[in-house]
Amino acid sequence: MTAFTDSSYYSQTFSELEMQDQCIEGVEFEGCHFKQCNFSQASFQRCNFVDCEFEQCDLNLLDLGYSKFSDSLFRDCKMRGVDWSKVSWPRVLFAAPVQFFQCLLDDASFYGLQLPELIVEDCRACRADFREADLSQASFQRSDLSGAQFSKTVLERADFRDAQNYHIDIFHNRISGAKFSRYEALSLLNSLDIELSD
């Protein structure tokens, strides 16, 4: 299969599609499962994903211009450099409509997004941009956040237990009620310009 010829697909499974660099526009997917598909540098323009799952897919540099997501899950996917700010998000969100498990999210951008309860678990999100985002009650458990950017980010009641390599300035982010593992939480003191000794 080289292209989606219908305008909508329901409860279908797509396996091992090779669609890198292709443009898919105005297609609705509901209850669909994408497994081991290659969408690297592809473009989903004004598409709608409802209750969909992506598993072991290559989504590097995927362009999601004006597409919509609801109750969608990404598991064990490569998603480097995806700009999530291009997605058409609902104006009011009580919980993030996407979840990430065991994904590579390096260099992804979530800049300025309102995504409360976002799940980024067991992921690598090196150099990801979370600045000015509302990620209250998000979960970053067991994720590598080396070089990830947090500034003016709402992280109240977020869960960073067993996350690694994060740098969060406690003066420029809202972290009230957030959970941290004891050892890694020492990195929060970096913004205090103090010297620790045993």
Regions found by a protein language model. Name each.
Residues 1-198:
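Tandem repeat scaffolds
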